[in-house]
């Protein structure tokens, strides 16, 4: 029995609140069970120096957790003077995942910056951030289209992410903190809306896992991501 009493293939309650903040071109509050993340997409004209004269746009992401998003307060990374390795890893994952959704040539000389701020963490913050950021990014692209800046939509695919793992010997979907901290295997999967993989991150925390278990986890992830993409579409319609 899972701590949340969910079935093995059951997602936590998931919702997206669009236009959550006033000023960003795209803004979403994603709620995944007790995990809550604000995802804002901002657009500026210009691209990083390494893309000068490349005739393509760029997307980058930043990720952070509020000091009391967890059970006990943690210092802001700014007060420590540097980002932690986990933060850097997650924001790179978000950026890679969303760039895979875009034709950057069609974006033109613009940079989209995604800001993900975790306001409450109960496992799955990186996957929730990707799911909310995809919607915020699409809202930002629609903003450019309404202004007549983009003539062709650069969006190739929606993207979504979910965690899977082996908890008490059973493959389960969408781990919360209680499960994640006790899982034998933990995996994050990012996919497109045409059933293609962007990233698979998997680690055995105790016993090694076998190909049969890997297949079960991948199938669980595909099942969950299909539902998440349906929720994204509902939020955007």
UniProtKB/Swiss-Prot annotation:
It catalyses: tRNA(n+1) + phosphate = tRNA(n) + a ribonucleoside 5'-diphosphate. Keywords: Nucleotidyltransferase, RNA-binding, rRNA processing, Transferase, tRNA processing, tRNA-binding. Its EC number is 2.7.7.56. Phosphate binds at residues 86, 124-126. SUPFAM superfamilies: Ribonuclease PH domain 2-like, Ribosomal protein S5 domain 2-like. It holds the Pfam family RNase_PH_C. It is an enzyme of class 2 (transferase). Signal peptide: none annotated. GO terms for molecular function: 3'-5'-RNA exonuclease activity; tRNA binding; tRNA nucleotidyltransferase activity. GO terms for biological process: rRNA catabolic process; rRNA processing; tRNA processing. The keyword Iron-sulfur does not apply. It comes from the Bacteria. Belongs to the RNase PH family. Homohexameric ring arranged as a trimer of dimers. Phosphorolytic 3'-5' exoribonuclease that plays an important role in tRNA 3'-end maturation. Removes nucleotide residues following the 3'-CCA terminus of tRNAs; can also add nucleotides to the ends of RNA molecules by using nucleoside diphosphates as substrates, but this may not be physiologically important. Probably plays a role in initiation of 16S rRNA degradation (leading to ribosome degradation) during starvation. PANTHER family: EXOSOME COMPLEX COMPONENT (PTHR11953), EXOSOME COMPLEX COMPONENT RRP41 (PTHR11953:SF0). NCBIfam families: RNasePH. This is Ribonuclease PH. It comes from Coxiella burnetii (strain RSA 331 / Henzerling II).
């Amino acid at each position: 029995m899972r701590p949340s009493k969910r079935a093995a293939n059951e997602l936590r309650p998931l919702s997206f609140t669009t236009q959550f903040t006033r000023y960003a071109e795209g803004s979403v509050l994603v709620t995944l069970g007790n995990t809550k993340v604000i995802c804002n997409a901002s657009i500026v004209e210009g691209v990083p120096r390494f893309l000068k004269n490349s005739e393509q746009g760029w997307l980058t992401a930043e990720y952070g957790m509020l000091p009391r998003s967890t059970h006990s307060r943690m210092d802001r990374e700014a007060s420590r003077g540097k980002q932690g390795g986990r933060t850097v890893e997650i924001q790179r994952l978000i950026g890679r995942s969303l760039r895979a959704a875009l034709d950057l040539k069609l974006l033109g000389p613009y940079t989209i910056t995604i800001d993900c701020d975790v306001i409450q963490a109960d496992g799955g913050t990186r996957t929730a951030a990707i799911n909310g950021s995809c919607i915020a990014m699409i809202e930002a692209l629609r903003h450019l289209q309404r202004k007549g800046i983009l003539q062709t939509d650069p969006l190739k695919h929606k993207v979504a992410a979910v965690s899977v793992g082996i908890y008490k010997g059973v493959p389960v979907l969408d781990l919360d903190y209680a499960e994640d901290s006790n899982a034998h295997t933990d995996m994050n999967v990012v996919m497109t809306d045409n059933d293609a993989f962007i990233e698979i991150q998997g680690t055995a925390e105790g016993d090694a896992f076998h190909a049969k278990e890997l297949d079960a986890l991948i199938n669980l992830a595909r099942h969950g991501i299909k539902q998440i993409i349906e929720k994204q579409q509902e939020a955007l319609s």
